[in-house]
């Protein structure tokens, strides 16, 4: 087989294999990604058995895969294949809860299939961006699986108990690529009376509500998708809705969230930076900022501002990050007070909260 072409810019093209049983979907993805100067389509497969046979031949850097296919599903394929063959896989799916199961067993990211012609260009642009990110990612199927089990049952986690100091704490957490399971790994280890949390996870429309519901089922605290006006209170975590900026605001003695369709910040909506900057403006409360795995630098500069205002800041370390972009930039610019592995972020957070009395 011919060697992978090198574009004029000197960067080696990313070898992509498309796995989808739909001829229409395959054609759309192949045509769209082939037009990108950084991407080369090296082959396709019509189902997971076909993919298993062709991967050694095509040697892809990244695979795009539908979740629902006849015969063995994409989810079952990932469960069986990724533990011994950790390839970056991007899911291409309609609105489906199985996406989160696939992320739990090691898929790197996902893109929602377009539902009309108008959204096709945006779909291809998003998929191409995620392919480029995934080519530098480190899939963690074993870690992802561990995040879903083997931990203390939510009801068995000791509560923090009454505390006037903790009543004045607000926790912000931001993540992107690899963050759905990293965030779950943190939150499953936190008690039911945790101070209020606001979570920004880059995610397509339709999925943030399902993600919040999943966290709510698996964690001790209440978790739901945020709505403007929701009051921040202990035992409640709010997930920023897709395509809206989510900011913390003060109204008298209360703290609420404001979710608006504003401009993108740091290239994202919702943006971790927008959320962190709003928290930095709320200087009358004790703040904690946590930045997790993700490509780019969204959240890094907002976390700097939080630290300047006296917040306690935590960054996920390189070894446990699927993509050490956001936490890496935050670390490099001095935004992070302490780095921790994904499995230890909750311990670091709880030690800090207990120190506040």
What are the functions of these language-model segments?
Residues 1-17, 22-34, 38, 44-64, ...:
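Conserved acid/base catalytic micro-environments in cytosolic active-site loops
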